[in-house]
Amino acid sequence: MTKAVLTSISQLALKALLYEVSLSPKPGLVDRFDNGAHDDMSFMTFIDSMIALSPFFQAYIETGFAYAKEEPLLLFNRLRQLGQKAEETMFCATQGINTHKGLNFSMALLLGATGAYLARTPHLMTDLGCFSKEDTLAICRLVKPMTAHLIQADLGHLNTKKEFTYGEQLFVTYGIKGPRGEASEGFTTLTNHALPYFRQMISQNDPETSQLRLLVYLMSIVEDGNLIHRGGIEAWKGVKADMRLLLQQDLSTTDLRLALSSYNQCLINQHLSPGGAADLLALTFYFAFLEKLL
C-alpha cells in the first residue's frame, strides 16, 4: 500500500515534466512545435531525459519517507547522492546535453520532502484527495532546514577555484543563487507567487489557458539564471518587461498563442531561453496535481 502511494506521487512528478515540455508555444524553450533557442536538444531529447530520471523520482520520495526522522542535513546528503546518480544517468541518456539538471535538483528535494511529510501525516497516505495548499506549503518549508547550509557550502569558497560551472559563474558575476537559493529559502517563489497565481487562473479559465498564462507570469517575475547566462542582466530585464506588458493585455487564448509564437521567434533570434521559468512551471504542475487543480 505504502509503496503504491509513493509510486503514484512520483509519477505525478514525471507527469509535471511531461506537461511542461508539452505546453506550446513556449518562447525560447523546447516544446511540441520547435526547439526554441536550443540547437542541441529537441522534444525527443527531453523524453529521453525524463525516462532516465523517472526511477530516481521514486527513489527520492521513498528515501524521504524512510528517513523522515533523520536530521535534515543527513536526509539532504542522501538525496544529493541519489540526485548525482540521476544526473549521470540523464547525461548518458541525452549524450551529455543538460535538459533537467536544475530541475532534477529541485525535484530531489521536493520529492524527498514530500516523502518525509507523508510519513508524518499518515492520513494523507489513505486519502490523497484531501491534499491541500497548506500541505504544499508544509512540504516546501521542510526543504529549508535541509538546505540552510547550501549557499555557504557550495558557493562560499569560489575564490579558490579557477574554473566554474555556469551556475557558479552566475553567482560570482551577478550574485544569482539559482536553484540552490530557491531551495534554501523554502521555494518561496513557488509558494508565494507561482501557485497562488495558478490557483486563481485555474478557477477562472480552462487548463491550457491557465498554463500559458502561468508561463507568462513566471517569465515576468523569475530571477532566471538561464536568461542571464545567455544574454546578461539587461536581456533578462527586457524579457520580464515584455511579459508584464503581455499579461496586462489580457488576451484570449487564441491571441495569447499567437503572441507567444511571435515572441518565440524574437527570443530565438537573440538566443535566449527562460529555463528558470520552465523549471518553476514544472514544479507548479507537480503541486497542482497533488492539490487536484489539474
UniProtKB/Swiss-Prot annotation:
Gene3D superfamilies the UniProt entry points to: Triphosphoribosyl-dephospho-CoA protein
Pfam family, one: CitG
Similarity comment: Belongs to the CitG/MdcB family.
Domain of life according to the entry: Bacteria
Lineage of producing organism: Bacteria, Bacillati, Bacillota, Bacilli, Lactobacillales
This protein's encoding gene: citG
Name of the molecule in the record: Probable 2-(5''-triphosphoribosyl)-3'-dephosphocoenzyme-A synthase
InterPro entries: CitG (IPR002736), TriPribosyl-deP-CoA_syn_CitG (IPR017551)
GO molecular function terms noted in the UniProt entry: ATP binding; triphosphoribosyl-dephospho-CoA synthase activity
This enzyme's EC code(s): 2.4.2.52
GO biological process: prosthetic group biosynthetic process
UniProtKB keywords: ATP-binding, Nucleotide-binding, Transferase
Catalytic activity: 3'-dephospho-CoA + ATP = 2'-(5''-triphospho-alpha-D-ribosyl)-3'-dephospho-CoA + adenine
